[in-house]
Amino acid sequence: VPLNTVMLARGSSSRPEPLERMLAAGAAGLKIHEDVGANATALDMALRVADAHDVQVCLHTDGLNEGLLVEDTLRVIDGRTIHAFHIEGTGGGHAPDVMRLAGEPNILTSSTNPTFPFGLNTAAEHAAMVELVHVLRADLPGDAQLARDRVRPATMAAEDVLHDLGLIHMTTSDSQGMGRIGETLRRTMQLASVMRDARGAAGDDDNDRVLRYLAKATINPAIAHGIAHDVGSLEVGKLADIVLWEPG
């Protein structure tokens, strides 16, 4: 079955050659992740290589703030364009202030679907999820504290509003425990409905808000990753994203 899929290569390297080899092999972008190094050297190198090859860097920032604080990350990025993952209340990244990355003119932002819309059991679910995905033991004080620090309910609630204000540009599934690939569009539309009830209608009808939220899962990611000429919207000349048929 044909799929509109691009692959991201591991972006954590102090030298350009490994990154360039992966791009030459067909990778469409680079991914920096805290689990294998979201330090200053790796981040700067990935951005240098990405600029040279006109691809995107996706960033999962340093959640333990061991190598970089959020201010340090902004300093290393130095105005270059980047896609920051997990602009949300869990999932990883600078704790507790990863939301600081939202609103920067050069930073494209996304959040993963398990955190929105924020509900009664959202925070409780994520503590168990973090422990499972990162192989933590709840009976070890250090592991338990790490899981608690990664789940920030107030930030999760703020995430919904930041989406409605347009400060978070994309909705994603991520992978493994943090993401649910089959729920991205459904949760995106649920969030639009919740925000309409919470913040009021955007006009005489809901069309504007619906289109803005639809863009978070379609054209915005396509633009962010340089593939909007092929996918992301229904236009002449693009690959088909939808098929209409009349059941017999």
Give a label for each model feature.
Residues 4, 28, 55-56, 108, ...:
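Residue-level detector of anion-binding/catalytic polar loops
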Residues 17-39, 63-74, 79-213, 225:
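Active-site neighborhoods of metal-dependent hydrolases
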Residues 1-3, 49-59:
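Alpha-helix-loop-beta-strand connector modules within alpha/beta enzyme cores
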Residues 1-17, 34-35, 228:
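Metal-cofactor-binding active-site regions of metalloenzymes
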Residues 4-6, 58-60, 200-202, 231-233:
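Flexible, glycine/charged-enriched surface loops at secondary-structure junctions
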Residues 20, 44-48, 160, 235:
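Alpha-helical segments flanking ligand/cofactor-binding loops in enzyme cores
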Residues 5, 11, 30, 60, ...:
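Divalent metal-coordination and catalytic microenvironments
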Residues 214, 222-248:
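Acidic, glycine-enriched loop/beta-strand segments at the rims
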